[in-house]
């Protein structure tokens, strides 16, 4: 299913190719959490990010679909109580925040790590900073490939995920390895390229 622009960091714009979007986190709900679960972990990532940025958002060029791809983390939340059954639309993110959200809202007791916009905007005077919590899709506007965004909820046997501070999605993936009791996954697609369907 296509991810609505409401949940995107960038939306298509005919004049500038892309502009900032509403950047609201989507509503997510779940059930059937295993009785043995001690905490939940939420990870959202784009599995189609170009591994080279040479052609990204460059006028007169395209990012070829054949280019190798990597994961880009958009949201990592740990220590969600196993009794929580939903996160409301916009409850954790509502708008683009230059230099990143520092203390994003979330379920009581949950902690949110930095997303990969922290790296993407590194060195940018206007946007550089630490981006905690959810920030939505903003694939290259000239990418030939439709991007896939995976929202993954993990039920774990960990009372507290062993990550601290400005933790990353990759660190959380490593920390929960061997501790996952159940997994639920929802995948959506998004593009800023009008020629990609």
Predicted feature residues:
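N-terminus-centered regions that define maturation/targeting leaders and the start
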Residues: 1-197
């Amino acid at each position: 299913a296509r991810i609505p622009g409401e949940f995107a960091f960038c939306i298509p714009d005919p004049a500038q190719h892309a502009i900032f979007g509403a950047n609201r986190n989507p509503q997510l709900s779940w059930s059937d959490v295993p009785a043995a679960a001690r905490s939940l972990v939420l990870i959202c990532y784009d599995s189609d990010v170009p591994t080279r940025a040479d052609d990204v958002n460059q006028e007169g060029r395209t990012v070829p679909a054949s280019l190798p791809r990597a994961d880009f983390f958009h949201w990592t939340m740990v220590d969600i109580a196993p009794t929580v059954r939903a996160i409301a639309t916009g409850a954790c993110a509502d708008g683009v925040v230059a230099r990143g959200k520092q203390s994003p809202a979330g379920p009581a007791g949950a902690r949110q790590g930095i997303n990969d916009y922290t790296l993407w905007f590194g060195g940018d005077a206007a946007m550089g900073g630490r981006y905690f919590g959810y920030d939505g899709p903003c694939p290259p506007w000239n990418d030939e490939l439709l991007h896939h965004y995976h929202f993954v909820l993990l039920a774990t046997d960990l009372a507290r995920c062993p990550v601290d501070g400005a933790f990353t999605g990759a660190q959380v993936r490593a920390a929960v390895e061997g501790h996952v009791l159940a997994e639920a996954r929802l995948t959506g697609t998004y593009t800023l390229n009008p020629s990609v369907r």
